[in-house]
Regions:
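Bilobed "Venus flytrap"/periplasmic-binding protein-like clamshell domains
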Residues: 90-99, 103-120, 154, 173-230, ...
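A ligand-binding cleft/hinge motif common to bilobed small-molecule-binding domains
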Residues: 135, 150-162, 208-215, 236-271, ...
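Catalytic and substrate-binding regions of cell-wall glycan-acting enzymes that process beta-1,4-linked
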Residues: 503, 517, 527, 658, ...
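Export/targeting segments at the very N-terminus of extracytoplasmic proteins
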Residues: 315, 551-600, 633-636, 650-654, ...
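Substrate-binding/active-site groove segments that recognize
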Residues: 196, 201, 426, 431, ...
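Periplasmic-binding protein-like
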Residues: 95-96, 158, 167-183, 227, ...
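Extended ligand-binding regions for polar small-molecule ligands
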Residues: 48-74, 81, 109-121, 180-206, ...
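Extracytoplasmic small-molecule ligand-binding "clamshell" domains
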Residues: 39-40, 46-153, 157-161, 222-236, ...
Length: 741
C-alpha cells in the first residue's frame, strides 16, 4: 500500500469487524482497532491523493471566546547589573531557530558559542530570541525585548546613531554574487550599470550600491526583497537563476561556498566593513564587558585558515578546529541541534581545553588527513581507525573506541559463512578506508575476490543502505556502525568479523578508533591521551555510547493502540481539544501526533533528550515559555503551539493541508531539512509545495552524498520524516473514522 493511499473503505470494514468482536469480550476490555498498516519509508508516486478529502483543508474555526495567548516576556532595558539580577542574557538573532549545518566558520555558530561563553563568565543563562525580520532587530533592542543583537550587523554611521556597537568581531568585504556559469556576468563595478541587484532595504549593502549607482554604475537598479528573507536564501535564489545578482559579506559567502557550488563571487563593492554586536546606548556596563571579552577571546583567534600550532598556540587562539564528516554517527544536525558520537567527544575535549569548538567538514573522507597536515584543522575526530598506513602520516591518540570490522550482507540475500567463501565475490569499499587495507591483506590468503572501489564522498552508511536494497552484494563496516544502522532498519546482518594482523587491541574489538593530530603536535596529542584516559567508560562516555550505538530509535509497535467505545482516543483528549482549539489545529491530528511521539506517555524522554507527550526539546520548550514538559498540560501546550508556529513558517499561499504535512516533517527532522528537500524538489521539477509524491521523494535524497553535501543543513535520514508523516496521516484517518467530530 502507498504511504499516502490509506483505504477508507477497508478501514471502515475493519472497524465493523472489531466492534463485532468486542461484543464477545468483557465490558472491561475496550475494543482495539488494528493499528494503521505498516508504512515502508518510500516515497509515494505523484498521483491524485485519496487522503486529501479527509485531511484538514483549513484550520478549524476558533472557539467563540479563545483563551488569551501567553503574555509576551516583560520588556527590560537595564544595564549589566540589572541583567545579572534577572539571571538571563537575552540575545536577539535573525532568522530561523536552526543554523546551517556548521561545516566551517559559520558566523551564527561562532556568535552563539562566544555568547554562551560570555554568559557563563558573567554567571548568566543565555536566551536567543528570533526577530521576525531583519529590520525589526534594532527596534526590538531599543524597546527592551532583548539585551544585545548578534546578527552579523555591519557598523554604519546611521545605525550608530540608534545603538552602541561593541568592538568589531570581524572585518569583511561585500561581494557581488552571481550564478556560476551564467552568461554575461559583471566582472567589475562599472558593469553593474543597468543591472538589477536584489538585497534587503535595511541591509548595509544598499549604501554601497547607492554609491555605485550615483557614480561609476549609473542606472544600477536596487530591487528590495522581503525583510524576513535571509541573505543565504537570496544567494540560493541567485544560484538557481531565479534572481540575477545579490550581495553578501565575504565570511558568510565562504560558508555558503562550502556546500553550494553554483555560487560565484564576482568582485567586492566595499572592503574593510566591520561586523559587531550591538547594545542600547544607555547600557555602557554591558558594552564594556563585551568589549573586554571580545579583546580576550576574539582578537586572539587565528588570522588565517592555515595554522599548524601545537596546544599552547591553540589555547592562545581560543579555538579548536576539528575535522570530521557529516553522517548519522559522527556529526549531524537534528531538530536544529548538533549531534554525533565523535562530535560529543570533540566538544568535551574543547571544553576541557577551555577553547571554542569549530567544526570543519572536508568534501570527502580522503581529504581528512591532507587537510590536517595542511593546517586546515587541528584534530581529526571522524571515527578514524588506527592503521599502520595512517600512522605514517599522522599521530594517533589513545583509542576512544574499539570495534571489529565485519563483512556485511543482506539478510535475505546470498549468505557467506566463512573466509573461505570470499573467493569470487565482489566487496564494495572506499579505497581510503581501513577496510580496503584489511581486504588487501586477505587477498593473499583467501583470494581471489574483487574489491570494488567506491567514491570517497560515499559514507559507510550509504554502502550499508545499498546492501540492504540489494544494489550491491557485500561491504565492510565497523561493528558499531552496523549495530546503529540495525536500530533503524531490518535487512542487514554481519556475516563474520574480518581478522586483522597482530594481536587484538582490546577484548572489545581488534581495531582502535582515535583522534588524529599532526606528528609534530606532541603536546596536543598528550592532552588528548589524558582526556581519553579520563573520559573512557565514564558516565558521559557510556551515555553517548548508548545514545548512538545501543539505543534503538525505531518506533516500537509492541504497545497496542486502543480506542474505547466511548470515543476516547487517550486519557488526554480534553487537553488536546483545548489547545488544538486555541491554536487552530484538529485535535484528532494532534492526538495522532502525540501517539506517534510518545505512545501517550508524558514521562517519556527520548535519546536526544526530548520530553513529554509531544517530545519537545527542552531548548524549544524554554523558547516557548515552558519548563515542565513532562506535565501533560504543559507538554501538550508546547507541542501544539510549536506545530502552529511550524505551519505558519511555510508560505500562506501553500494549501493548508500541505503546510500541515511540511510542519509534521519539520517537527520530526527539523525545518531546515524540509526546506532543503523543497529546494531539491524544485530542482528536480517536482512540486516544492506538495508533500506526498514530491517533497517526500526529495527528503529521501538527503541520505545521498551528492545531495546532502550541497544541502544547507547537511545529512538527514530522510526515511524517518517520510515514515513519520505517513503514519500520522494514516492514524489520523482512523481517528476521524472513529470520531467524526
Amino acid at each position: 500500500m502507498s504511504s499516502s493511499g490509506f483505504n477508507l473503505s477497508r478501514s471502515r470494514w475493519l472497524l465493523v469487524a472489531v466492534l463485532a468482536l468486542s461484543m464477545a469480550c468483557e465490558r472491561s476490555q475496550p475494543p482495539a482497532p488494528p493499528p494503521p498498516p505498516p508504512v515502508v519509508a518510500k516515497a509515494s508516486t505523484p498521483a491524485p491523493e485519496p487522503e486529501d478529502p479527509i485531511f484538514p483543508e483549513a484550520p478549524p474555526p476558533p472557539p467563540p471566546a479563545p483563551p488569551a495567548p501567553p503574555p509576551e516576556p516583560p520588556k527590560a532595558t537595564g544595564d549589566l547589573a540589572a541583567i545579572r539580577g534577572g539571571g538571563t542574557l537575552r540575545v536577539l538573532v535573525e532568522g530561523t531557530d536552526e543554523d546551517f549545518l556548521p561545516r566551517q566558520g559559520m558566523p551564527k555558530a561562532q556568535d552563539r558559542a562566544l555568547l554562551e561563553r560570555f554568559a557563563e563568565k558573567q554567571g548568566l543563562a543565555v536566551e536567543f530570541i528570533q526577530a521576525p525580520a531583519f529590520d525589526q532587530l534594532i527596534p526590538m533592542l531599543r524597546e527592551g525585548r532583548g539585551d544585545l543583537i548578534a546578527a552579523d550587523l555591519t557598523v554604519t554611521p546611521a545605525r550608530a546613531k540608534e545603538i552602541a556597537f561593541t568592538r568589531p568581531l570581524r572585518v569583511v568585504s561585500e561581494f557581488v554574487v552571481g550564478k556560476r556559469g551564467a552568461a554575461e556576468l559583471p566582472r567589475k563595478p562599472e558593469q553593474l550599470a543597468g543591472r538589477t541587484v536584489h538585497v534587503r532595504e535595511s541591509n548595509s549593502f544598499v549604501d554601497s550600491l547607492r554609491e555605485l549607482a550615483q557614480g561609476k554604475a549609473s542606472g544600477l537598479v536596487i530591487a528590495p526583497v522581503p525583510e524576513s528573507t535571509e541573505t543565504e536564501e537570496i544567494v540560493y535564489q541567485v544560484s538557481r537563476g531565479e534572481l540575477p545578482l545579490t550581495v553578501a559579506d565575504s565570511h558568510l559567502l565562504t560558508a555558503i561556498e562550502a556546500y553550494n557550488p553554483d555560487v560565484e563571487r564576482l568582485f567586492p563593492i566595499a572592503e574593510g566593513r566591520q561586523i559587531a554586536w550591538a547594545v542600547r546606548q544607555e547600557n555602557p556596563g554591558l558594552k564594556l564587558a563585551l568589549d573586554s571579552f571580545i579583546t580576550e577571546h576574539v582578537l586572539t583567534e587565528y588570522a588565517s585558515e592555515r595554522f599548524t600550532g601545537d596546544l599552547a598556540a591553540i589555547r592562545k587562539r581560543g579555538v579548536l578546529r576539528v575535522l570530521t564528516r557529516n553522517n548519522p554517527i559522527t556529526y549531524f544536525l537534528h531538530r536544529g541541534e548538533q549531534y554525533g558520537f565523535d562530535f560529543e567527544l570533540a566538544r568535551a575535549a574543547a571544553e576541557e581545553m577551555g577553547v571554542r569548538l569549530e567544526i570543519v567538514v572536508p568534501p570527502s573522507r580522503d581529504l581528512l588527513i591532507p587537510w590536517l597536515n595542511e593546517g586546515r584543522g587541528d584534530v581529526i575526530a571522524a571515527s578514524l581507525t588506527v592503521t599502520p598506513e595512517r600512522s605514517a602520516e599522522v599521530a594517533f591518540s589513545r583509542p576512544y573506541l574499539f570495534v571489529e570490522e565485519v563483512l556485511v550482507q543482506r539478510a535475505s540475500g546470498p549468505k557467506l559463512a566463512s573466509l573461505a567463501e570470499l573467493k569470487g565475490q565482489k566487496i564494495h569499499v572506499r579505497a581510503s578506508s581501513s577496510y580496503h587495507s584489511t581486504l588487501l591483506a586477505l587477498q593473499k590468503t583467501h583470494g581471489p575476490f574483487e574489491i570494488v572501489q567506491e567514491p570517497e564522498d560515499l559514507e559507510t552508511e550509504a554502502l550499508l543502505d545499498r546492501v540492504a536494497e540489494g544494489e550491491i552484494p557485500f561491504t565492510v563496516a565497523d561493528s558499531h556502525l552496523l549495530t546503529a544502522e540495525q536500530s533503524y532498519r531490518d535487512g542487514l546482518e554481519a556475516a563474520f568479523p574480518l581478522p586483522v594482523e597482530g594481536a587484538p587491541a582490546s577484548k572489545e574489538g581488534s581495531r582502535g578508533i582515535a583522534f588524529a593530530v599532526r606528528k609534530d603536535a606532541t603536546k596536543l596529542r598528550g592532552f588528548l591521551d589524558g582526556f581519553v584516559k579520563k573520559m573512557y567508560r565514564g558516565t558521559l562516555y557510556n551515555m553517548w555510547r548508548k545514545r548512538y550505538f545501543e539505543n534503538s530509535r525505531r518506533v516500537t509497535e509492541a504497545k497496542v493502540e486502543r480506542v474505547e467505545v466511548s470515543g476516547t482516543l487517550s486519557p488526554y483528549d480534553s487537553i488536546f481539544q483545548s489547545y488544538s482549539s486555541r491554536y487552530g489545529m484538529d485535535w484528532r491530528l494532534m492526538a495522532a501526533q502525540a501517539y506517534q511521539e510518545s505512545r501517550f506517555n508524558p514521562k517519556l524522554k527520548s535519546w536526544v533528550g526530548a520530553i513529554g507527550l509531544f517530545q519537545v526539546m527542552p531548548a524549544t520548550g524554554r523558547q516557548l515559555g515552558f519548563r515542565k514538559l513532562e506535565d501533560p498540560d504543559e507538554g501538550t501546550h508546547a507541542g501544539v503551539m510549536y506545530m502552529q508556529q511550524l505551519v505558519n513558517r511555510f508560505e500562506p499561499g501553500i494549501p493548508f493541508k500541505h503546510r500541515l504535512r511540511f510542519a509534521l516533517a519539520s517537527y520530526n527532522a527539523g525545518y531546515g531539512h524540509v526546506q532543503d528537500a523543497r529546494r531539491i524538489a524544485r530542482e528536480k521539477g517536482w512540486n516544492p509545495d506538495k508533500w506526498f509524491g514530491h517533497v517526500e521523494k526529495a527528503m529521501l535524497l538527503l541520505e545521498r552524498p551528492q545531495y546532502y553535501r550541497r544541502a544547507r543543513y547537511g545529512y538527514c535520514r530522510g526515511s524517518e520524516p517520510v515514515k513519520y508523516v505517513s503514519e500520522i496521516q494514516n492514524r489520523y484517518v482512523s481517528y476521524v473514522d472513529l470520531i467524526p467530530h
